[in-house]
Amino acid sequence: KQIAFVSNRDGGKATKIYVMDTSGNNLRPLTNDAKLIWITSPNWSPDGKQIVFVSWVIGKGAKGNGKSSGIFIINRDGKNIREITKDSKLTSVESPSWSADGKQIVFAASAAVGKNGNEIYVIDINGKNLRQLTKDANDNHHPVWSPSGRQIIFSSRRTGNYEICVMDINGANIRNLTNHPAPDYQPSYFVPSLLSVSPVENFKLTNWAEIK
């Protein structure tokens, strides 16, 4: 078993993905591309062979500032890194989650610079067949695929407050699972084979990790 996490432990401003054994041994950087300046949300594929993540990239930039965010996939040995959202104009990309069969990624993003509210999208891992599931500009975030592969849970402000919602994988049958004055967000399905770790007190060094 191994843990993937994000850190800037080398002293630079950019973050990298690191992998280590669950014992803490065999620590090594997985990403080392100077164009990837801020990496977040590493997520193991169901078969443990790949990791999807979000990164800000030095380049043309959707915001005209020389930087843009995208979704990347990398092999667990650090090879074959590729951006699967490079052909889209989406911004504020976040929270990628694998489908149960490992063939698709669900994520949240904004369709245009300055547009209020993220929407939920799904894309094949080869970067093809991008489709939008929510179309309501209600600030939808943190999508997670169900282990059955039939539903997606996410947080949404469609009722004026962040609640946990669920929908079918085609975007139909959206309904609230929570209804509370306090905001509810960042849902997660419990999968016995996978454990997420987020030590907030060490945010500057390790802000997200996952055991596989």
Per-region residue spans from a language model:
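Sequence signature of WD/YWTD-type beta-propeller architectures
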Residues: 1-212
